[in-house]
Amino acid sequence: DSAFAMARRAQRGWAARSPRERARVLLRFHDLVLERQAQGLDIAQTETGKARRDAFEELLDCALTSRHYARVGPGMLAPQKRLGVFLALTDTVEHHHPKGVVGIVSPWNYPIALAVGDALPALLAGNAVVLRPDIQTTVTALWAVDLLREAGVPEGVLSVVIGDGK
């Protein structure tokens, strides 16, 4: 099975969870990133050559992004009443539904912020994600994906495909 076929199957169960349940996973991920920051910093520094404070800034950005989406996302995904075309005659309710599978191709220079940071809102919205990190920073991406799985993202909902794109 391809990563996309597995993601399509796994996405249905993930989308069936409420946005609040998915937000709890993102909050747990936030906590895990901060608990294991030394390991993440070591990996990111080794792969990118960044100074420790720059790697920390990216790691912290990812954790805070996760927390932000976990806090505001469920409200953004809730049905919203909107003005109808004819104000007194119509009511309109906007509903949000997952798209299915989201593909992310990320560069080497911000392997956590641009790879995982982009995956977080997609996951919160109930989508599955297939991530293809740059070949120079695969271990950093795999580290973050392992934390997301530990936080509660089900198997198949978040996959990593490694290769040079050929």
Predicted regions and their residues:
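N-terminal Rossmann-like NAD(P)+-binding subdomain of aldehyde/semialdehyde dehydrogenases
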Residues: D1-T90
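Rossmann-like NAD(P) dinucleotide-binding subdomain of oxidoreductase/dehydrogenase enzymes
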Residues: L34, K81-K166
